[in-house]
Amino acid sequence: MSQGLPHEWRTAETRDLFAAILSLRTQEEAERFFRDLCTLPEIEALTHRWQAAQLLDQGLPYHEVAARTGASTTTVTRVAQWLKRGADGYRLVLDRQKRTSGRTA
């Protein structure tokens, strides 16, 4: 665990961050906010995780997901674990995107 985050990650500070994210209205606003908030490697890491979640949801094997995304197999495995036993955040967004694009969940 990161030394900077307490065991209970839902703090007033993290809630404030999520409220700020929810105030964004467009993709351009999100891009601008995250570019200021994160380093390029942090954005790349988040992107790899999200791509991995999408590809794992399509049933691709771990090694292929790693090859396509540039994420390590450790990261792909971690994403797969969170897809199965996480807070259902990945599942929430994956299913929502499927519904809005007309695909079935």
What are the roles of these predicted feature ranges?
Residues 1-24:
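General nucleic-acid-binding
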Residues 18, 42, 60-62, 97:
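Hydrophobic/basic alpha-helical segments enriched in Actinobacteria
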Residues 29-49:
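Short, Lys/Arg-enriched anionic-surface-contact patches
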Residues 40-43, 54, 65:
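N-terminal helix-turn-helix DNA-binding core of bacterial DNA-binding proteins
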Residues 46-60:
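Short, amphipathic alpha-helical "recognition" segments used to contact nucleic acids or chromatin
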Residues 64-69, 76:
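Short alpha-helical "recognition helix" segments of helix-turn-helix
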Residues 80-94:
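Short, solvent-exposed alpha-helical "recognition" segments
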Residues 93-105:
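Intrinsically disordered, low-complexity basic tails/linkers immediately adjacent to helix-turn-helix/homeobox/MYB/SANT
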